[in-house]
Amino acid sequence: MLNDFTGADKVYIACGYTDLRKGIDGLARMVQKQFELDPFTNTLFLFCGRRRDRIKDLYWEKDGYILLYKRLEQGAYQWPRSESEARSLTPQQYRWLMEGLKIEQPKAHRPVTELAVL
């Protein structure tokens, strides 16, 4: 379900460690207070614990929250640990993260920003 989640307009990850004992209210409060984002939008918020094999996802669905919990049987997520901020992900970065890859792929093709006909 999470590997191809397309229901959200935006995806944010909470960089660094998150205490996964937090439930819906604690995670929504974290989104609102710490990251200064609106948890009542069509946005998927991702949180990862210290062991990096478990994530919680918070999503508002017009009439209530959905809280998803995923535990990997093998391996770990390549989660950014350096900062305590919410970081927006592109759809490609989200797919990479769910596939066990880093969200910054040094060998991936970069989008062209300057177009010119030679």
Feature-to-residue mapping (PLM):
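Polybasic/polar functional segments that serve as interface/processing modules
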Residues: 1-118
